[in-house]
Amino acid sequence: MKQYIVDAFTDKPFAGNPAAVCVTEAPLSDGFMQKLARENNFSETAYLLREGEGWRLRWFTPGTEVDLCGHATLASSFVLLNYYEKENDAVQFYTRSGTLTVARKGGQYEMDFPVCPQREVPVTDDMEAAFGIRPVKALLGDDLVCVFADEEEIRRMAPNQTLLMKLDGRGQSVTAPGTDCDCVSRSFFPKLAVPEDPVCGSAHCQIAPYWAEATGKSEIHAYQASRRGGHLYCRLQGNGRIAISGEAALVAVSEIVAKESPPPVKRVARDAGYKPALLGQRLKALAFALLKPLCFSLVAAPQRGVRTT
């Protein structure tokens, strides 16, 4: 099985968000995919399997399978359109979040994702304790999004991972207005065994719509201000969908040699009356019953080379 390491939302290796992309020839068990994702220890490992005219796509963090992942989808598109479907400029994925289409446009890959509904919720002391700074606004959808006044607060932030676990949402994202872009953000997913996602595409299904409404723009340039950093170009399409674009860079190609473990041998449960000695007696009786006809036939047959009178 081929595995590709791709950095998403960047045009150069060792930046953006790394993802492992496995191109499979047959279905793998959930257990095997989870073990390999844990071994890779990236925020996401993607698994691709040809299905009809498209590809079945599943995403695993080191801790669990997830319903949607932006950067691993972008990475998967990069792999397929550069190494498996070079003649095409678009690829279709069948996922737990429905059918997703990604189109290659120049050097970028544009993903068509659903906008994630969200509502404003009260800012709490627990949020302030977790982030070390009090947000000016909070929104809750699949993730908790906390808005801050200054992008430097986002860059310097060192959240308490234990306290983040107690907040609502699958993960927690923080965002603020940007100086050289429309917004900066960071995303944390300790509940999924991902302390910080370097560049999170799916989080911008909430972040970008918020800033589009706040600024009156339909196109949002977002920068994820993690240590690795990455750029996302988001466009609200007005139909409950959002286009999220970015670049990608190949880092490595490898062969996965580990195989699925064989299914465990089912052992017959011993009943209360099981006794090894009794079992041995039964086996002896069975052997005697099978060999008895053969013994009698040998005794009854005349022996060659012996005269009889």
Regions found by a protein language model. Give the residues of each.
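Active-site proximal loop and beta-alpha junction motif in alpha/beta enzyme cores
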Residues: M1-L68, L74-P262
